[in-house]
């Protein structure tokens, strides 16, 4: 989850199942985009989907996937080192609440591998 007008480094890829060019902003997003392409349960993927509404209008969800059974699946990518930060938790909770209001129950986070 990041701001709509994020100015960081962006990698653009043309991937199967994605409705537009896939723009990823970190290695976690990039790796998960490739996982979604290989997932047989996923029919279509949209990335960096803006959240509508006043309370969350400046942010985007990382991945909104339409599954083969017609249900939606939402995934937010975040580094494990950011998970304990209050703002990160607030944004993730805002995303989860937003998608629950839009009848999406399959919401989850994607984290990088924990370093030992």
Question: Could you describe each region identified by the protein language model?
Answer:
Residues 1-116:
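Electrostatic, structured charged patches in enzyme active sites and in nucleic-acid/phosphate-binding
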């Amino acid at each position: 989850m990041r701001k709509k007008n994020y100015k960081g480094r962006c990698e653009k890829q043309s991937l199967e199942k994605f409705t537009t060019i896939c723009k990823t902003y970190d290695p976690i997003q990039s790796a998960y985009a490739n996982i979604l392409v290989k997932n047989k349960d996923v029919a279509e993927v949209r990335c960096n989907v803006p959240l509508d509404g006043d309370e969350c209008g400046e942010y985007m969800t990382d991945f909104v996937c339409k599954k083969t059974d017609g249900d939606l699946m939402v995934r937010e990518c975040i580094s494990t080192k950011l998970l304990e930060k209050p703002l990160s938790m607030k944004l993730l909770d805002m995303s989860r609440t937003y998608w629950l209001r839009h009848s999406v129950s399959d919401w989850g986070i994607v984290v990088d591998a924990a370093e030992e």
